[in-house]
Amino acid sequence: MDLCNEKDIRALLGRHGFSKSMGQNFLIEGWVPRDIAEASGAGPDTGVLEIGPGIGPLTVQLARRAAKVAAIELDRTLYPILAETLAPYPNAEVVPGDAMKLDLAALVSDKFSGLTAIACANLPYNITTPVLTALIEAGCFASITVMIQREVALRICAAPGSSDYGAFSVFCQYHTQPELLFEVGPECFLPAPKVTSAVIRLVPRSAPPQNLVDDSFFFQVVRASFAQRRKTLLNGLSSAFGSRLSKDALRGAIEAAGLPADIRGERLGIPEFATLASALQNRL
């Protein structure tokens, strides 16, 4: 059975009583899950956490390479389908549940003892940001390789000053080194979505790019700086910190960080945000 063949997909769904697509976009180009699995670095010493396996095309490719695969799936209607498609792969296990509510670090510790843990998934577009955030914050993966909407991939990898650069860019780049690997066109899916997808790999940093006294405050400053993109950094910070610091104090913090008072938040890289956060914290 070819899980990327339209005829085989329809036959599989029919055997399990589904006449329609179940609201999913099925991969119909076999090179896509194969190349994603290859890019993930899955191998005989790795345990792979997958989120949202669908009918299992990526799961199968991962199971052929990795020592073990644990695929988190929330939709119970997919369990009998996955039981069939993964039957030849005893090293692949479906984990029932919501990835957003599970303790991912504990799950990895339980399932992948003695293995290098990596994450690999074709993520549903509507939960990309919270799932990626959870994977990064779990702090237990050697790499995270995911297919997501191209627009989000560009934001994650964006440089300061670009229109795609934002608070999520800073978050991902502070914790990881992201790399856009390749794009996947709408024609690779059935039905074809209206957007292009992209595969990215995020490798967690062994040490943060900046030494911060307070990570939480740093990201509070980052979010405030991007909250009103068309306004200056000073105005953005005023909205967030105006109840605690006067505009003159905020202006002084910006200048103490070596930044012009009229700069916009999207011009700042991680080092500048770190210096600014320190200057602000010294005035609180």
Locate each region found by the language model.
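C-terminal lobe and adjacent flexible extensions of AdoMet/dcAdoMet transferase-like proteins
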Residues: 223-284
